[in-house]
């Protein structure tokens, strides 16, 4: 009954609503809106034309680590932070003056074997111990050394240091494990030799630096297959020495406790004579630009590698060279990529970097282009280097591109401060390159203080566009005529530096 009454009342109310509106008549017509001026519709993509302005400049205050030398010669670099985790790493310094020149890849293979068991935790027992700690080891080998790193909670500092010392000092080097690891390593290296860009850089560095310095860090398949467990043991006993190593610790720790634990776990690392240091190989003398060509029949693209030598990391003027190369080819907005990608549309990307090692440096440019644009791309790269370096060039470096490079380098340094493992990685440079403790703290200020005219002088002094090493992997029949038309001698490559035969499959 109540529902029917409510329904009736609602119907009556709705029926009465129209009577509330004012009645329309001829004397009271409906009011029309006043006309408005014509306005052109907004371009929905106009905002893309407005380049965003840079944000606030990042301030950088990179802390200076402490250095303690143990009696056995081990250097301890430590940096306390408020981070919730610890980053610990052992760095073994090695180079062509210690390692045998006729055994490329031996140092990397030795490092790979470190985590396959120790004398205290053989085989899978080491993996179980690491898993119990809730972490894992990372091992990385470069041209200057090997880094063995681990992350742990501050409460696990003692256990983490114990495992790190075991891996670095007491590897088991089981013959059974060696056979498996070497087979996997060779397969990975062979796979990398199927990558045109990897091949072009290997060929280029061999020609630029010679067999010793220029050999690939991970070795050649044929050479790796010749190595035995005895080679690994010999390499470890002559290179993994406390006087040739550093321990880096970054995170939340008590300095007194850390020193005591380091002495406990690393103090027994015996100091002994290592391998005699050989004379540093002389770099091949480059007198003119030359092209090395590896045939990859019917390849739709050419992998291009262009390089020439620069001073080593520890040589004076590192900040100038780093800023110069970053401005030239280190960014998407750098002139090299803007030319080859944005202007010419030859490639998806062309970049250059400064490879700065303990004994040498190199400007290395890498890109891949459509086969028909190979010679054009080489010509543009050489022209860009000429415009950068030649005196009275019509296209010298300008403030905008240098400022972008400055900001990128400084911001990347700032990013390091948020991660203990990145700070630890930065500390590696201090030991490997014999740099002062405040080097990282000063680097940002040095980058910011380099005047434009000084950077232009650096380009003229160090960039030599007439003595380039150019390595190309591509369809030789298609690209050879264009390369010869550039006026450079073209040398066919069929083998790598150790005699490794190169038979690239047709596409």
Briefly describe each language-model feature range.
Residues 8-19:
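Bacterial N-terminal signal peptides
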Residues 21, 116-120, 150-182, 331, ...:
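M16/insulysin-pitrilysin zinc metalloprotease superfamily fold
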Residues 27-28, 32-46, 126-235, 284, ...:
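Acidic/histidine-enriched segments that form metal/cofactor-coordinating
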Residues 35-51, 217, 246-312, 472-507:
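An aromatic/glycine/proline-enriched structural segment found at the starts
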Residues 43-68, 206-245, 277-282, 312-314, ...:
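Histidine-acidic residue clusters that define the catalytic metal-binding segment
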Residues 89-154, 194, 215-218, 331-346, ...:
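M16/MPP (pitrilysin/insulinase) zinc-metallopeptidase core fold and M16-derived inactive scaffolds
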Residues 184-203, 282-301, 338-347, 358, ...:
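Short acidic/His-enriched helical or mixed secondary-structure segments at domain edges of catalytic enzymes
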Residues 201-202, 212, 229-265, 466-468:
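Non-catalytic, conformational "gating/processing" segments within enzyme and secreted inhibitor domains
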């Amino acid at each position: 009954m109540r529902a029917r009454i409510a329904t009736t009342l609602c119907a009556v109310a709705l029926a009465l609503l129209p009577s509330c509106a004012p009645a329309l008549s001829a004397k009271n017509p409906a009011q029309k809106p006043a006309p408005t001026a014509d306005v052109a519709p907004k371009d929905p993509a106009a905002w893309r034309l407005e380049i965003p302005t840079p944000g606030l400049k990042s301030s950088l205050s990179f802390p200076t680590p402490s250095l303690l030398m143990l009696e056995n010669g081990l250097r301890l670099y430590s940096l306390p932070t408020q981070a919730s985790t610890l980053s610990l790493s052992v760095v073994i310094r090695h180079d062509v003056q210690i390692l045998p020149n006729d055994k490329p890849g031996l140092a990397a293979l030795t490092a790979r074997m470190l985590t396959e068991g120790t004398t205290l935790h053989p085989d899978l027992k080491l993996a179980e111990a690491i898993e119990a700690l809730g972490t894992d080891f990372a091992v990385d080998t470069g041209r200057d050394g090997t880094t063995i790193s681990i992350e742990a909670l501050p409460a696990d500092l003692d256990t983490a240091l114990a495992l790190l010392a075991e891996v670095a000092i007491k590897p088991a080097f089981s013959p059974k494990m060696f056979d498996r690891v070497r087979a996997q390593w060779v397969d990975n290296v062979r796979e990398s030799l199927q990558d045109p860009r990897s091949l072009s850089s290997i060929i280029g560095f061999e020609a630029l630096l010679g067999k010793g310095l220029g050999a690939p860090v991970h070795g050649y398949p044929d050479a790796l297959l010749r190595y035995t467990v005895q080679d690994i043991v010999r390499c470890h006993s002559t290179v993994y020495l406390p006087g040739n190593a550093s321990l880096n610790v970054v995170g939340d720790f008590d300095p007194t406790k850390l020193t005591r634990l380091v002495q406990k776990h690393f103090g027994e690392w015996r100091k002994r004579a290592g391998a005699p240091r050989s004379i540093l190989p002389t770099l091949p003398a480059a007198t003119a630009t030359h092209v090395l060509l590896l045939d990859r029949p019917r390849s739709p693209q050419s992998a291009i590698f262009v390089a020439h030598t620069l001073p080593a990391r520890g040589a004076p003027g590192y900040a100038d060279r780093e800023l110069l190369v970053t401005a030239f080819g280190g960014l998407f907005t750098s002139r090299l990529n803007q030319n080859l990608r944005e202007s010419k549309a030859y490639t998806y990307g062309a970049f250059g970097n400064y490879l700065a090692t303990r004994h040498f440096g190199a400007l290395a440019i890498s890109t891949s282009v459509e086969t028909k644009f190979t010679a054009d791309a080489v010509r543009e790269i050489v022209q860009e280097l000429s415009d950068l370096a030649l005196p009275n060039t019509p296209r010298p470096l300008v403030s905008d591109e240098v400022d972008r490079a400055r900001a990128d380098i400084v911001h990347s340094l700032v990013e390091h401060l948020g991660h203990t493992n990145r700070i630890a990685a930065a500390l590696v440079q201090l030991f490997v390159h014999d740099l002062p403790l405040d080097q990282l703290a000063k680097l940002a200020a040095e980058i910011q203080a380099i005047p434009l005219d000084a950077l232009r002088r650096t380009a003229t002094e160090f960039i030599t566009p007439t003595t380039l090493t150019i390595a190309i992997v591509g369809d030789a029949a298609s690209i050879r005529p264009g390369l010869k038309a550039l006026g450079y001698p073209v040398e066919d490559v069929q083998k790598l530096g150790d005699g490794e035969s190169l038979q690239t499959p047709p596409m």
